[in-house]
Amino acid sequence: MADLQKIVDDLSSLTVLEAAELAKLLEEKWGVSAAAAVAVAGPAAAAAAPAEEKTEFTVVLASAGDKKIEVIKEVRAITGLGLKEAKDLVEGAPKPVKEGVNKDEAEKVKAQLEKAGAKVELK
């Protein structure tokens, strides 16, 4: 049981980019794809969405604009990522910055990023 707790602790300490890399490595090793499960579940969720008000939002950085350094600083402040990870996220736009947040939090993050000069979308 202690081994399982150590694995949980190790996984919890990964950055977003490290977790994404781990997912890719596991997909390759096990011969599976997480995208297939998402694609199957996607249309069913989309059909149900119009009936209810959306409660969870994803803040997507569409582009960094002219003030890339300011946007990188804001992304670091919002996500807690390191400098390299935040720079990679900003340069790889469009990318999600925050996922599964409520409307107020999403609007707050959007305002912070737009103030820094970024173009942001809420999904």
Curated annotation (Swiss-Prot):
CDD domains in UniProt: Ribosomal_L7_L12
A Gene Ontology biological process term: translation
SUPFAM superfamilies attached to this UniProt entry: ClpS-like (SSF54736), Ribosomal protein L7/12, oligomerisation (N-terminal) domain (SSF48300)
Gene Ontology CC terms: cytosolic large ribosomal subunit
GO molecular function: mRNA binding; structural constituent of ribosome
Gene3D superfamilies: 3.30.1390.10, Single helix bin
Superkingdom to which the source organism belongs: Bacteria
Alphabetized Pfam families for the sequence: Ribosomal_L12 (PF00542), Ribosomal_L12_N (PF16320)
Keywords: Ribonucleoprotein, Ribosomal protein
HAMAP family: Ribosomal_bL12 (MF_00368)
The organism of origin for this protein: Rhodopseudomonas palustris (strain BisA53)
Protein name: Large ribosomal subunit protein bL12
Physiological role: Forms part of the ribosomal stalk which helps the ribosome interact with GTP-bound translation factors. Is thus essential for accurate translation.
Family statement drawn from the similarity comment of this UniProt entry: Belongs to the bacterial ribosomal protein bL12 family.
Classification via NCBIfam families: L12
Subunit structure: Homodimer. Part of the ribosomal stalk of the 50S ribosomal subunit. Forms a multimeric L10(L12)X complex, where L10 forms an elongated spine to which 2 to 4 L12 dimers bind in a sequential fashion. Binds GTP-bound translation factors.
